[in-house]
C-alpha cells in the first residue's frame, strides 16, 4: 500500500493512515524540500515567480499538507503510538521551518523579485504573497537578532 501522506491527488486518505507512515513521509518531503531549496539558492538566473516562488510554494504545500494531516489525526485520533511519532517528528518540522524563515539568501531573492520589473506584471495575489514573505522574513530576522542580542547581554 502506498503512503497516503504522499498522495496529493485528492482529499486526504485518512482511512488508509497508519502511524508508521508519518516518519517515512516527513523524511521524504523534507529531503525533497531541502533539495529544492539548494537548487533555488544556487540558481544564478534572474529571479522570477516561475523559477523561485512557485517551486517553493509547491514543495512547502506538500509538506504542510502532509504534516497538517498528521497534526489533525494526532488531535482527533490520539494514541500512544501516534503521539510518540508525532512528538519525534515535531522538532524536525519546527527546525526546518525555523531555518527557512531565517535564510538570508532566500530573503535576498524575494527582495530581488520585488525590485524586478516582473513584479508589476504579476497578479495582485502574487504580489501580496511576495510582500507578505518579505514582511515575514523581516520580522523573523529581527526576532532572531533580538535573541542574539539578549544572549550576548546575558553573558
Residue ranges and their predicted role:
Residues 1-155:
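Zn2+-dependent metallopeptidase catalytic domains
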